């Protein structure tokens, strides 16, 4: 396994843990998320207040900085879009 693959898997696992911890979602629900699983607007737990907590927790756990101008509805739309964003931030 390459370091890049390990890093991608680590970001995936971290994102799932953050979604579980911040939103209070069941482990089984989070484990079942795939790239197309809808998030913002589809999960009642994922409201505007939860977005702030989720992004703060991602910053802390991944050691990244998320700028306000980077946050938009497209990035929060699905598990896949949020995962792609988080992975891109870890590469910067």
Segments the model singles out, each with a brief description of its role:
Residues 2-46, 50-56, 60-92:
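Phosphopantetheine-dependent thiolation modules in NRPS/PKS and related acyl-activating systems
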């Amino acid at each position: 396994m390459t370091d890049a693959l390990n890093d991608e898997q680590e970001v995936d696992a971290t994102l799932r843990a953050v979604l579980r911890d911040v939103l209070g979602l069941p482990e089984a629900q989070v484990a079942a998320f795939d790239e197309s699983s809808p998030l913002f607007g589809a999960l009642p737990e994922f409201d505007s207040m939860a977005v702030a907590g989720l992004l703060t927790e991602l910053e802390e756990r991944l050691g990244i900085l998320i700028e306000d101008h980077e946050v938009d509805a497209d990035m929060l739309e699905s598990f896949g879009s949020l995962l792609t964003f988080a992975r891109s931030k870890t590469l910067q």
